[in-house]
Amino acid sequence: MPFAPSLLSSSSSVSQFLPRFPNATRFNVTPRSRAATVVAASVTDLAGVDSTTIAVLGGGSVAALAAMVSLTDPERRRKLQAEEVGGGDKEVVREYFNSTGFERWRKIYGETDEVNRVQKDIRLGHAKTVENTMLMLTEDRSLAGVTVCDAGCGTGLLSIPLAKEGAIVSASDISAAMVAEAEMKAKAQLPSENLPKFEVNDLESLTGKYDTVVCLDVLIHYPQNKADGMIAHLASLAEKRVILSFAPKTFYYDILKRIGELFPGPSKATRAYLHSEADVERALGKVGWKISKRGLTTTQFYFSRLIEAVPM
């Protein structure tokens, strides 16, 4: 991670966004030549974390644990678990987020204190991504009357703020449990005329046309060859803007992901795919879109690249 980024920048001006982030977190990486100053959480903490969660380490600690990757076979473990629920990644993700994953992530995305320190940190990171997304969407225009597709809406953490700003929101998720939770929360916070339209659906099956399509922290479930097609599909639904967030692929993050796979648990049936910004930009370019704004959210245990794309 050879950077200490601001949370949001644009291709035209970086500084214009910085005053809007008084609490922006800058992530400074410990040089490899120094002893580790960022230590992994306890195994007790990590046991409750998904394969999408990476234990952040430094220096020799990373090298030592990275060597352990060859002693385990997380891919074989995932394959066996996948066979139990019918095969491919989509079925695994659907099953996971309708069962143990739903309970875990409902706590992380909620306000309960029944989470460990790693999960609290992830909660903070995802909340920052939602905040930064809302800033991208409202920086230079009102959302009143704007049609927005929230693809992979989870428990409604973005859908509800969008509706509060006057957007006409269509929200979907592969998990029926997540959609039910999002709908319940929306009804408690919004008047009936402003409620998003919720549906259970996977990304591949989404149809329609929207001013803006948003897909946050979902591409982590897609390998790059499938992510290219998914990005193209999402762009085909959008008229003006596409906003995506994804776990950035770097050598350091890739090692940390592999370390995270060493810790057993039911969530390891779900694969966690990292994506390079260049690959995402290339996929957008192939279908006539270009990146207009870029952002990055980082906490100790959460990192997510955020981009806004517009037609060329």
Curated annotation (Swiss-Prot):
Keyword terms, alphabetized:
Chlorophyll biosynthesis, Chloroplast, Membrane, Methyltransferase, Plastid, S-adenosyl-L-methionine, Thylakoid, Transferase, Transit peptide
A cellular component annotation (GO) from this entry? chloroplast thylakoid
Q: Which GO terms describe its biological process?
A: chlorophyll biosynthetic process; methylation
What SUPFAM superfamilies does this protein's entry cite? S-adenosyl-L-methionine-dependent methyltransferases (SSF53335)
Q: Which reaction does it catalyse?
A: Mg-protoporphyrin IX + S-adenosyl-L-methionine = Mg-protoporphyrin IX 13-monomethyl ester + S-adenosyl-L-homocysteine
**Locations listed in the record:** Plastid, Chloroplast membrane; Plastid, Chloroplast thylakoid membrane
Knockout consequence? Lethal under normal growth conditions and stunted albino plants unable to produce seeds when grown in presence of sucrose.
Q: How does it sit in the membrane?
A: Peripheral membrane protein
Tell me the route in metabolism or biology where this protein functions: Porphyrin-containing compound metabolism; chlorophyll biosynthesis
PANTHER family to which the protein is assigned, alphabetical: METHYLTRANSFERASE, UBIQUINONE BIOSYNTHESIS O-METHYLTRANSFERASE, MITOCHONDRIAL
What protein does this entry describe? Magnesium protoporphyrin IX methyltransferase, chloroplastic
Q: Organism classification, top ranks?
A: Eukaryota, Viridiplantae, Streptophyta, Embryophyta, Tracheophyta
The gene behind this protein is CHLM
